[in-house]
């Protein structure tokens, strides 16, 4: 399975600084920022969860188990990297004291009362990232060039596609095309990079033997096992997929949408089309205090293009790219032609997003083409560089670093 972010174009031509990230979890620190309005009403307890080497969902489940509640009773606003030190808010609407929970590499601190947290209830994240063994002398030129071009390309990072097994976008496309058996073969059968269960996956890909897979797939592959059991009951891979929780099904479709967005952005760079200047036919997103308001969009025409470009210069608007779906706002003119080309080359049509089973249907939307990190600063320590910046939700720090490091 090819790297879904490997061939994407860089915006800057300056050489990268190289180096390594995430050598140690402490090299990648993430602190979540949520709206203050969360604390204005509500009776749920809000805690800061500090974790290291834990996936968010695994940490939530372990905490829930320790206090005797179902994990769905603990709310959270966003998922965070595993190989990192992360601080995020969680909520629980029960009279329990999470500060008493003792789990290795997890700390919990009560910070007040508020409304229950849900996915998406965050403004963004502060990052402190150490890049080791780099060439810091090359940094000023790449930073200056990125500033001149309006920021960094807002690619979806590898996390969106599966870091150790980058198959989510492939599964998403096959589901969209109604090829459920092929989608199942990829999801169940493609091995990862030295992961437990890889050999069982390989055998399934070769033999398609469901009974053998059920004997050999480890118990922790619970979604895969649930699908295999459902297929055995029904003989339908479509029904087997629908046994999965809605958030998991949506990950597949979101991943394919993200893949297409990345292709659009890369193609726009390749064709020399601007990212920080609107063209007639573009859709722009309103920006308030540095935060893109992705649901507030307006179309660029010959009549308003100068006004829109003034707004972009003033930091009040950003050019957007497509998150394809059955209700997304289409570009026109040159940007619209590019959108049509990307869809055509992928072999999908917009109506496919509506023909999906209900839990997978996606209306689509728009996403800004550039990342403009706020409070951006860096410090050089010998061959290491320590970066600090804030990014709005849904934006990947690794995409900023990709442009700076170019490795």
From Swiss-Prot:
tRNA processing listed as a keyword: yes
The keyword Isomerase appears for this protein: yes
Enzyme Commission number(s) from the entry: 5.4.99.27
Annotated transmembrane regions: none
MF terms in GO: RNA binding; tRNA pseudouridine(13) synthase activity
InterPro entries named in the record: PsdUridine_synth_cat_dom_sf, PsdUridine_synth_TruD, PsdUridine_synth_TruD_CS, PsdUridine_synth_TruD_insert, TruD_catalytic
Any Gene Ontology biological process: tRNA pseudouridine synthesis
SUPFAM superfamilies tied to this protein: Pseudouridine synthase
Family label: Belongs to the pseudouridine synthase TruD family.
Protein name: Probable tRNA pseudouridine synthase D
């Amino acid at each position: 399975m090819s790297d879904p972010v490997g061939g994407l174009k860089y915006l800057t031509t300056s050489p990268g600084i190289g180096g390594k990230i995430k050598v140690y979890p402490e090299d990648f620190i993430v602190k979540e920022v949520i709206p203050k309005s969360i604390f204005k009403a509500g009776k749920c307890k809000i805690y800061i969860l500090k974790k290291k080497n834990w996936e968010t969902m695994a940490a939530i489940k372990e905490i829930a188990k320790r206090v005797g509640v179902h994990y769905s009773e603990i709310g959270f606003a966003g998922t965070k990297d595993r190989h990192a030190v992360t601080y995020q808010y969680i909520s629980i609407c029960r009279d329990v004291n999470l500060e008493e929970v003792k789990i290795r590499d997890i700390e919990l601190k009560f910070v007040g009362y508020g409304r229950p947290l849900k996915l998406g209830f965050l403004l963004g994240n502060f990052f402190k990232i150490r890049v080791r063994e780099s060439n810091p002398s090359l940094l000023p030129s790449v930073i200056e060039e990125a500033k001149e071009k309006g920021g960094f390309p807002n690619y979806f990072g590898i996390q969106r596609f599966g870091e150790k097994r980058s198959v989510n976008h492939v599964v998403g496309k096959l589901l969209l095309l109604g090829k459920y058996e092929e989608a199942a073969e990829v999801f169940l059968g493609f091995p990862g990079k030295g992961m437990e269960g890889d050999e069982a996956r390989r055998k399934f890909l070769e033999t398609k033997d469901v009974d053998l897979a059920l004997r050999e797939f480890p118990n922790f592959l619970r979604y895969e096992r649930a699908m295999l059991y459902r297929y055995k009951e029904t003989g339908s891979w479509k029904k087997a997929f629908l046994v999965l929780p809605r958030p998991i099904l949506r990950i597949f479709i979101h991943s394919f949408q993200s893949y297409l967005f990345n292709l659009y952005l890369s193609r726009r760079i390749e064709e020399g089309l601007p990212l920080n200047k609107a063209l007639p036919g573009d859709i722009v997103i309103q920006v308030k205090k540095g935060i893109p308001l992705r649901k507030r969009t307006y179309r660029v025409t010959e009549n308003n293009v100068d006004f829109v470009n003034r707004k972009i210069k003033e930091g009040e608007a950003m050019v957007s790219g497509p998150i394809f779906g059955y209700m997304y706002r289409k570009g026109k003119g040159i940007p619209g032609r590019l959108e049509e080309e990307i869809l055509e080359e992928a072999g999908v049509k917009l109506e496919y997003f509506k023909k999906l089973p209900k839990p997978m249907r996606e209306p689509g939307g728009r996403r800004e083409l550039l990342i403009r990190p706020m409070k951006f600063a860096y410090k050089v320590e010998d061959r290491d560089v320590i970066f600090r910046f804030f990014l709005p939700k849904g934006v990947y720090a690794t995409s900023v670093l990709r442009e700076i490091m170019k490795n």
